[in-house]
Amino acid sequence: MIIKLIFLICFKIVLSIDNKTKFNETLILDNIDYWVKFNDTITLDSNITSEIEAVSWNFYNNTFNLLAICGKASNFCSCSNYSTSFFNITNNCSLTIFLIDETLFNTTYQIVYSTNIINYKINLLIPVTPPIISYNCANCSINCKKSNGTNTNIFLSINDTIVTYTNESILNYDYNCSILNNNFTVTCIINNTISTSNTTEFINCTNILLSSYLDFFQVTSYIFYMIIFIVTGITVSILISIITFLFIRKRKHVEEIESPPPESNEEEQQCHHDTTSIHEPSPREPLLPKPYSRYQYNTPIYYMRPSTQQLFKSYSLPKPCPPPKPCPPPKPCPPPKPCPPSKPCPPPEPYSPPKPCPPPKPYPSLPSIPLPPDIPPLSTQNISLIHVDRII
């Protein structure tokens, strides 16, 4: 055991001294990729054929770090400085990895011996899920995209015939529009070493021309409605401007007509002399037209006298009215006429006794009705009085 430790120490010293000088002379033997599931175990072969060899295992995590130092003699390999929780080294100096931690994946493990270097990259293998199919009838293209999974292969099948495949994440395929019909079935298959999945879709490109026409008509209708909206807005703006201009012009004309002409001083003096009397026009006085009404433009034109225009000034205040005349005192009411004396009541008429009633007249005797000879007397007949009355 002591001899083994001395041999390993000497090997480490020699390796550290000659590593820089021999590194440029080493030959990279191979780069190998492994796709492994979580919780699996993998063994990286050392490929050592000589009887006596010095071996070192490294792992790459941004930089290469020493994992273990081994020495092989005959069929025995002794190593040190490695974690037995995740790793184990066989008698051939091969490295066994227990993939129970995610940090062990996507890592490169390197073995160095003699003048050879082998790089092993461990990748995590994820199961696949159904792919996604998309197509464009106008460009005659089909796309098949991976949704999930690692180390995958994608196959494209048209009408149950595989036409192309790839190991990339997306498969693009341009088909011949003149050869294929407008209706066909597309199947996209994706798989890896642990799972497989597929998606099938029926493609119908018969209505591509109709859909393009519909898109054109839709855009045209949008443009048409936009033009109508713009033209309508411009027309309404022009009409509002014209109506506003005519209204302002008409109002200005009415104000010019309603404004009174300048009056002379004689008319003012005359108004001061007698404000209560109304000036009677003379036959020679001109008559001015009455201003137009703002609400009735088709009514006949009336004329007013010049002297009365002073009464319609908007800025002149009316003269105060004279005080009202006092009301005359009310006339006294005449005395009421005396009532005439009441007439005496006439004496009551004397009561006359009622006349005695005359005695009742005797009823006439009933005539005797002779009975027929064949009818027996009433005493012998069994006839009720009611029946007799009915017979009578």
Curated annotation (Swiss-Prot):
The keyword Signal applies. The keyword Signal applies. InterPro entries: Ig-like_dom_sf, Ig-like_fold. Keywords: Disulfide bond, Glycoprotein, Host cell membrane, Host Golgi apparatus, Host membrane, Late protein, Membrane, Receptor, Repeat, Signal, Transmembrane, Transmembrane helix, Virion. One of its GO terms (cellular component) is host cell plasma membrane. Residues 1-16 form the signal peptide. It is a single-pass type I membrane protein. The chain crosses the membrane at residues 223-243. Residues 269-283 have a biased composition (Basic and acidic residues). Residues 319-348 are annotated as: 5 X 6 AA tandem repeats of K-P-C-[PRS]-[P]-[PS]. Residues 258-290, 328-357 are annotated as: Disordered. Both glycosylated and nonglycosylated forms interact (via C-terminus) with the host AP-1 complex. Belongs to the asfivirus CD2 homolog protein family. This is CD2 homolog. It comes from African swine fever virus (isolate Pig/Kenya/KEN-50/1950) (ASFV).
